[in-house]
Amino acid sequence: MRRNRGFTLVELIVVVVILGILAATALPRFINLGSSARTAAIQGLGGSVSSALNLVAAMTGVSGTGTPGEQIDITWITIGGTPMRIWNGYPDRWCDGIGVSQQGFTAPGGGCYLSAAAVPYGNFTFYGYGNGQIPGGDAGWRIESAPDPAQCSVQYTYNGSGTPVVTVNTSGC
């Protein structure tokens, strides 16, 4: 009597088809993980920037270095040993203002006042006001590896007389 070894051609084709269906079902989920990670990172950064904005406004009010909403000259406060440029009671729109509000961010040597230059910060890049990289030319951060970096960003819109607005853009992540 002859012993059969292995699989028949029909069994092999059935297994390959089943594996193909499973792969086609699971692949979109794995591809979307990068987008989800970028979206979560931008949303987390937006929350951090909003918290820093409120903290700095409270600190400037308490320390007497400027009352939010009151027009004053540029001044400085120190948070965790890092000097921060303040205007009108809020972080200014340059990398040595709102940029240094994020732990671990280091402003370039010589400062960056009136500079829209890109400053890398972890997975993000910070751009000062007038940069053309963040919608409206506002200051902010973006993820350069996103499909549309300008729409995977955190905007810091500084309106000279009121509370700056933090906008999180995730449509391009």
Residue map of PLM features:
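Arginine residue identity/basic-tract feature
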Residues: 2-5, 29, 38, 85, ...
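Periplasmic/extracellular, small/polar-rich flexible segments of pilin-like filament-forming proteins
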Residues: 62-173
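Membrane-proximal N-terminal amphipathic helix
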Residues: 37-64
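Short, contiguous, well-ordered secondary-structure segments
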Residues: 15-17, 49, 55, 164
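N-terminal single-pass transmembrane signal-anchor helix
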Residues: 1-34, 41
